[in-house]
């Protein structure tokens, strides 16, 4: 009888523990308050820092507390072109300058934004990866909503009170640089999660994977498997509608979609 394979072992065990030891902290907008709703607050970028496990750089921004004699430090996802010593403005009356944070209703159609809120006050969840940006498509004043185009190309309707940062996230083109060696991949993933290296099933022994064994690396049977297959057998192309290259009408439809 074969062993408990990797796909089965992944499902067992304790709750995943994130690799957060050297992380700089959560990157969020300021908590939404009276000052941002009705005017603006001024902050200064004190440093641009690298956060292990994250592709985009972070900006540490210092604000004066609105009504106490102290300072507030916030971590923002850095926008392309942001620099140390730059003044940032957050609020309804802030200007349209890269790095400033405004509600979507104050941003004109066609503007490039990033780190967009999904719900008012959630401090930014959309278009946050390095090089990402969203585009403001249209405003609907009747329902007080805004339609935006996400990095995936899909369109989304969010409340017009949601905040966004002007510009696109810094670090664009990061994935275009090749890894070149296994050591770089090792250091990349060790600060993210235990997801590397991945051994292929055909490279294993028959006891370790249904695709293992043989005098050369081949699966030896159909790679498709039914939806209700038992654990340990359910590997490969699960409940696939079709396999192989797109040909004919399907290829033409896919090319048209791109």
UniProtKB/Swiss-Prot annotation:
Transmembrane segments: none annotated. One of its GO terms (cellular component) is mitochondrion. Gene3D superfamilies: 2.30.30.30, Nucleic acid-binding proteins, Ribosomal protein L2, domain 3. SMART domains: Ribosomal_L2, Ribosomal_L2_C. Keywords: Cytoplasm, Ribonucleoprotein, Ribosomal protein. It comes from the Eukaryota. InterPro entries: NA-bd_OB-fold (IPR012340), Rib_uL2_dom2 (IPR014722), Ribosomal_uL2 (IPR002171), Ribosomal_uL2_arc_euk (IPR023672), Ribosomal_uL2_C (IPR022669), Ribosomal_uL2_CS (IPR022671), Ribosomal_uL2_dom3 (IPR014726), Ribosomal_uL2_RNA-bd_dom (IPR022666). GO terms for molecular function: mRNA binding; structural constituent of ribosome. Residues 210-230 are annotated as: Disordered. PANTHER family: LARGE RIBOSOMAL SUBUNIT PROTEIN UL2, RIBOSOMAL PROTEIN L2. The keyword Cytoplasm applies. GO terms for biological process: translation. This is Large ribosomal subunit protein uL2z. Its main location: cytoplasm. It is found in: Cytoplasm. Belongs to the universal ribosomal protein uL2 family. The lineage of its organism: Eukaryota, Viridiplantae, Streptophyta, Embryophyta, Tracheophyta.
